[in-house]
């Protein structure tokens, strides 16, 4: 649903129109924004402005992300890498400008091991600070940064 929108980082306003961050911060209270939208060649990803409070195991993370807002979930491995890459194109600054936090924690993805016969207790995590995507026990505790495909 890109519709000729330039790659970049935007804030969705109340009617779901995308506003460039530099325009958004001119508002009386820019911290009213709850999410940013990352537009790339791969699509439009809406990202919560901060991690959910607390730590979660894999199943708890999936549930908490889904309860954040309708349509939200944990990011895929690919989306986590896109978020990391965007840190160097202004994503961290966008979060800060709307009162959020950079996505630099170790968080759950939405993906369990694709071969449950090998290890049904494993799932993928990402390190937002280093860009590392790896494997962890589903019962460990990690952060949750909810995301969603942006819908107008």
Q: Where is each model-derived feature located?
A:
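Extracellular adhesion/carbohydrate-recognition regions
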Residues: 1-72, 105, 109, 119-122, ...
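An exposed tryptophan-centered "aromatic clamp" motif
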Residues: 58-73, 77-138, 147-152
């Amino acid at each position: 649903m890109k519709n000729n929108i330039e790659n970049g980082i935007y804030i969705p306003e109340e009617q779901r129109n995308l506003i460039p961050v530099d325009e958004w911060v001119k508002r009386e209270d820019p911290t009213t924004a709850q999410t940013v939208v990352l537009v790339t060649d791969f699509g439009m990803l809406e990202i919560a402005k901060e991690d959910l409070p607390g730590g979660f195991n894999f199943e708890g993370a999936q549930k908490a992300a889904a309860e954040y807002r309708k349509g939200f979930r944990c990011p895929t491995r690919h989306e986590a890498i896109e978020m990391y890459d965007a840190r160097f194109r202004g994503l961290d600054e966008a979060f800060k400008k709307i009162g959020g936090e950079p996505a630099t924690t170790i968080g759950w993805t939405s993906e369990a091991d694709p071969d449950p016969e090998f290890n049904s207790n494993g799932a993928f995590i990402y390190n937002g600070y280093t860009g590392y995507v790896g494997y962890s026990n589903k019962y460990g505790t990690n952060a949750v940064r909810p995301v969603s495909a942006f819908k107008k």
